[in-house]
């Protein structure tokens, strides 16, 4: 029995300054474009821009 395709998908957020990644979910209907968030990067030890990758 197949399940219905939901609106929430799992995405990876990759740091623009190092290779660190976060994994999170986003709502496909509310955010159809790629996300860009400022989050803490433990490698460079400061807040940097993270971009959504496939």
UniProtKB/Swiss-Prot annotation:
**Gene Ontology MF term list:** structural constituent of ribosome
An example Pfam family from this entry, by short name, is Ribosomal_L33
The protein's UniProt keywords, in alphabetical order, are: Ribonucleoprotein, Ribosomal protein
Biological process (GO) annotations held by this record are: translation
One GO CC annotation: cytosolic large ribosomal subunit
Highest taxon of the source? Bacteria
Q: Which family does it belong to?
A: Belongs to the bacterial ribosomal protein bL33 family.
NCBIfam families in UniProt: PRK00595.1 (NF001860), rpmG_bact (TIGR01023)
Q: What is this protein called?
A: Large ribosomal subunit protein bL33
Organism, as annotated = Chloroflexus aggregans (strain MD-66 / DSM 9485)
């Amino acid at each position: 029995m197949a399940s219905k395709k939901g609106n929430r998908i799992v995405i990876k957020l990759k740091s623009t300054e190092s290779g660190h990644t976060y994994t999170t979910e986003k709502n496909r209907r509310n955010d159809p474009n790629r996300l860009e968030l400022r989050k803490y990067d433990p490698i460079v030890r400061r807040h940097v821009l993270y971009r959504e990758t496939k």
